[in-house]
Amino acid sequence: MGVKQTPPVQVKVSDADSTNRRKSSSQEGNPQLVQLKAKSDKDKRKGSSDSTASIMGSSNALPTKNLTTPPALNPLTTSISRGNTAYERSVNGSRITMHSNLAPTETQDVSWSEIDTLDDVKKMAKEPIVNDGFPRDFESNLTQMRKSHAQLLRLMRERNQRLKYAKLRSPPHKDQHNSATNKDQEPDEVLHDPEIALDGEKYVSQVVDTIKDVHRC
């Protein structure tokens, strides 16, 4: 048997491949072009890394707080400090005491007391007065009621004294203010003495009538 011979394979090179090969061969032959190309590639990589780092830094940056700036004051309240004791005056006028290791001075206490008293006086001046003064005959009725009450008390003391001596079988000592008789009286006679009973009813009725007059006023 005879061996079959294979025809040789022909490879066709395109014009673009030949052009690239010629460029690469020309660049390899020129070392200056190779250095310039490497430098440009390095600059491109560096620029891209710097831009990426700046973007990441700006996204991760936190707002800084100025620690040296004093805090803003509250416009609703004002604080006044004297010595080691501080007072705070709020908008509605009430006093808030900030406690400290020392007590406020006497002058400060007096000042706050005067302010509180002035506020109370202003508040009372705005309130309507329900009972402005007393009725016209109130004073005279009160005087009459006190007189009748005093007469009633005197009569009760006199009767108790006569009752005491009647129990002891001894007459009481007569003076200018004593209307007791010299004759001996029994305890029952003293309790039911018509003179004492009449005077007692008179003084009691005077007190009751005066109280009614006061209520009518």
Swiss-Prot record:
Organism superkingdom: Eukaryota
Biased composition (Basic and acidic residues): 38-48, 172-189
An example Gene Ontology CC term for this record: cytoplasm
Low complexity: bias regions: 60-78
Region described as Disordered: 1-85, 167-189
Residues of the signal peptide: none
Annotated Pfam families: DUF5315
Additional note from the record: Present with 1360 molecules/cell in log phase SD medium.
Protein's name in the database: Uncharacterized protein YBR197C
Originating organism: Saccharomyces cerevisiae (strain ATCC 204508 / S288c)
Classification lineage: Eukaryota, Fungi, Dikarya, Ascomycota, Saccharomycotina
